[in-house]
Swiss-Prot record:
GO terms for biological process: translation. GO terms for cellular component: ribonucleoprotein complex; ribosome. It holds the Pfam family Ribosomal_L4. HAMAP family: Ribosomal_uL4_B. It comes from the Bacteria. One of its GO terms (molecular function) is structural constituent of ribosome. One of the primary rRNA binding proteins, this protein initially binds near the 5'-end of the 23S rRNA. It is important during the early stages of 50S assembly. It makes multiple contacts with different domains of the 23S rRNA in the assembled 50S subunit and ribosome. Part of the 50S ribosomal subunit. Belongs to the universal ribosomal protein uL4 family. Residues 54-106 are annotated as: Disordered. Keywords: Ribonucleoprotein, Ribosomal protein, RNA-binding, rRNA-binding. This is Large ribosomal subunit protein uL4.
Length: 218
């Protein structure tokens, strides 16, 4: 399989060569990506559902206080019959069929999540929206990080993928409003498709490819 060529820029936004990325991660065609949009959708829906706390709750008529006796006699008052002042139709009454705490998480096979990520990355790569930036930061500097990213992504929302060793890069990009930093071992489909650009640091790309290649061989 032929590899995918990704452009590399330096910390000044100037071209600094290219890097080869595995076709199995970045090289699916637009037709193949389109055919797997339902897969991407299913994985993203499951991920967003798993992020929900599910702690919503209301009190039903058995949980609210009061209402131990019948408010008035059954007949002879001219009013509608009532059995409790805590019935749902009463002010301060219990809620009927209200939400209860629940777990929204869905079971998604690992192979589905891995495949969805590959198709999402391929979609961005097919549209020229995957890049590699060699930040080369000796100390944290948001100004330098902006200078490195601006020529590549302008003001578009960008997911920046870093290795665990890219401490200076992480501290530099985390305060940029249009940038969402994430470590290579945490990259997921949702953070790819919600970004207009996906930018890898050189170490971040190496870490990502190494992890996915090792997982496939295992």
């Amino acid at each position: 399989m032929a590899n995918v060529t990704l452009n590399v820029t330096d910390n000044n936004g100037k071209e600094a060569g290219t890097l080869e990325a595995p076709e199995a991660l970045f090289g699916f065609t637009a037709e193949e990506v389109q055919a797997h949009v339902p897969l991407i959708h299913q994985v993203v829906v499951a991920q967003r559902a798993a992020a929900r706390q599910g702690t919503h709750a209301v009190k039903n008529r058995g949980a609210v206080s009061g209402g131990g006796r019948k408010p008035w006699k059954q007949k002879g008052t001219g009013r509608a019959r009532q059995g409790s002042i805590r019935a749902p139709q009463w002010y301060h009454g219990g809620v009927a069929h209200g939400p209860v705490p629940r777990d929204y998480s869905q079971r998604t096979p690992k192979k589905m999540k891995a495949a969805a990520l590959r198709y999402a990355l391929s979609d961005r790569a097919n549209n020229g929206r995957v890049a590699v930036v060699d930040f080369q930061l000796d100390a944290p500097s948001t100004k330098k990080a902006i200078a490195a990213l601006a020529p590549v992504v302008a003001d578009n929302f960008t997911t920046v993928v870093l290795s665990r060793d890219n401490v200076n890069e992480w501290l530099s990009v985390r305060n940029i409003p249009t940038v969402y930093p994430i470590f290579a071992d945490q990259l997921n489909t949702y953070d790819v498709i919600t970004a207009q650009y996906v930018v890898f640091s050189k170490d971040g790309l190496e870490a990502f490819v190494a992890a996915k290649t090792a997982a496939k061989e295992a």
